[in-house]
Amino acid sequence: MVLAIDAGNTRVKWGLHDGARWRARAWVATAQAGRLKAVLARLPAPELIVIANVAGSVFGDKLRQALPAAATRWLKSTRAQAGIRSSYATPAQLGVDRWAALIGAYRLFGAAAVVVNAGTALTVDALTADGVFAGGMIVPGVELMRKALQENTAGLQRRTGKFSFFPDATGDAIMSGAINASCGAIERMARFLEDAGQAAPLCVISGGGAALLAPQLNLEVKLVDNLVLEGLLTIARDDGFAARAIQKT
């Protein structure tokens, strides 16, 4: 059994994989991660735990206390891993959630793609058909954009709006603007990839805001639940110890 954990700024997502399928997947709010120890204690014991933590070192210490006894690997971004290569100037500075998502996307689709994680932040990363991470960008996520505008501009409505091509209410205008800004960043990255010789890149998108963005994108979209967990599983499978651990289950 492999337990994969994606510790983000808003949610801690986890999944237990038995080598053939996900036996369980769920999440808790990062602010309520004290519940995680009791939740994980009810699961079958894993042989290996693989973690992508972007919630900070203090949270990482708390997470360690919640983990069951097992070999544990804390992911670090590197120059090359699991079939992809990083063009980041300093590979170790790339967020481990982005690195895991890139690995997961390439293992699932093996094609040129804009790899998007729509969470608190929106990460938009370029992946070539031969597995090179060319670079990427980070912008505020839809909810963060919306809240920042409402909290820093006098007189704007607090009501959450809906998407519209031609918004005729302030709440709708804010929501539509945030969604269009996000989609514009994604589609622009796809165009950069095409200009670099990567024909018709996919958009592989995951995260809590993915369902808001996917219908508005003028790209071939692959919506993937828990892409970071898929990447962590790929990393576990590519690790010799992890392969032996999975075979024992």
Predicted regions mapped to residue ranges:
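N-terminal glycine/serine-rich phosphate-binding loop of ATP-dependent small-molecule kinases
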Residues: 1-81
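Glycine-rich phosphate-binding loops at beta-strand->alpha-helix junctions
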Residues: 11, 52-61, 176, 199-216
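Adenine-nucleotide phosphate-binding core of ATP-dependent small-molecule kinases
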Residues: 26, 163-202, 209, 220-222
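Glycine-rich phosphate-binding/hydrolytic loop that grips phosphoryl groups
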Residues: 154, 179, 221-249
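Short active-site oxyanion
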Residues: 1-3, 45-49, 112, 197-203, ...
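Glycine-rich phosphate-binding loop and adjoining helix at the ATP-binding site
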Residues: 52-109, 217-237
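Glycine-rich phosphate-binding loop plus the immediately following alpha-helix
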Residues: 94-96, 100-103, 107-110, 134-176, ...
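Gly/Thr-rich phosphate-binding beta-strand-loop-beta motif of the actin/hexokinase/Hsp70
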Residues: 1-23, 105, 111-133, 149, ...
